[in-house]
Amino acid sequence: MAIADGKVSLKHLVTMETLTNEEVLGMIRRGGDFKNGRADFQLDRQYFAANLFFENSTRTHKSFEVAEKKLGLDVIEFDAGTSSVNKGETLYDTILTMSALGVDICVVRHSEVDYYKQLIDSRTIQTSIVNGGDGSGQHPSQCLLDLMTIYEEFGTFGNLKICIAGDITHSRVAKSNMRILKRLGAQIYFAGPTEWYSSEFDVYGQHVAIDDVIEDLNVLMLLRVQHERHRNDKGFSKEEYHTLYGLTEERYAKLADQAIIMHPAPVNRDVEIADSLVEAPKARIVTQMQNGVFVRMAIIEAILNGKA
């Protein structure tokens, strides 16, 4: 990875740890250029992209597709439900096939944490891998769009007070964000059920009661309760969770005037956040979705720069 002439160049994007601070800032600023119509971009040849999603997705899948088409790439359709995966084909062999067919970029979401390691270590696979989410591992493109949204609002990360609230243990979004936000100088708090928190996160921030910090926050980053990963847990009722840990209208009223609310979506309304607040003045949930297209354009451009 490198930056030349102000442009980020990547072979793969699988975790946030592989990016320098300069590369992170370069890509979120480039996302801003695409958003504001300032980006000068032209393909030097025909490129192919395939989006291989083995877990459900709306925003990540479709925003990558929009980003790819905006940049002029040819997008190869892939449906896991009708692919040879159902005949027992492994993920490795599926990506090996895409590489052999000449696909330049594969965006992959898979339930296996670190699925990408064998792909990027392969001497045969030549396609670039973009991690669209690996189980409860990481989600780098979501992290970058979150960073872009925060940067648009505050112009910096240093000394911002950011609370990541909710199902932290199972959240790839939380794991990507906590690492890079800490490195960029933000002060991180965690809130939510202690059952969904691990002491391994203490190196990044402090677990607190949301009501103890809400008045001081710059950013409240809410996380979806991942019901599909809690099948064997006693859990909470929707009403209990919302009352104890969610953003109620009463908590919203305590936020500072310049504070913003974020959520990676899909939103469980009246669980993580009151239904009435999803599009409230402080909410940036729609902005996050919009920024997702532009920061993913920046990611794809960086991958293509690495192929130049």
Swiss-Prot record:
Keywords: Pyrimidine biosynthesis, Transferase. Gene3D superfamilies: Aspartate/ornithine carbamoyltransferase. InterPro entries: Asp/Orn_carbamoyltranf_P-bd, Asp/Orn_carbamoylTrfase, Asp/Orn_carbamoylTrfase_sf, Asp_carbamoyltransf, Asp_carbamoyltransf_Asp/Orn-bd. Carbamoyl phosphate binds at R59, T60, R109, H139, Q142, A265, P266. Pfam families: OTCace, OTCace_N. Pathway: Pyrimidine metabolism; UMP biosynthesis via de novo pathway; (S)-dihydroorotate from bicarbonate: step 2/3. It catalyses: carbamoyl phosphate + L-aspartate = N-carbamoyl-L-aspartate + phosphate + H(+). Its EC number is 2.1.3.2. GO terms for biological process: 'de novo' pyrimidine nucleobase biosynthetic process; 'de novo' UMP biosynthetic process; amino acid metabolic process. One of its GO terms (cellular component) is cytosol. L-aspartate binds at K87, R172, R224. One of its GO terms (molecular function) is aspartate carbamoyltransferase activity. Coiled coil: none annotated. Heterododecamer (2C3:3R2) of six catalytic PyrB chains organized as two trimers (C3), and six regulatory PyrI chains organized as three dimers (R2). Belongs to the aspartate/ornithine carbamoyltransferase superfamily. ATCase family. Catalyzes the condensation of carbamoyl phosphate and aspartate to form carbamoyl aspartate and inorganic phosphate, the committed step in the de novo pyrimidine nucleotide biosynthesis pathway. This is Aspartate carbamoyltransferase catalytic subunit.
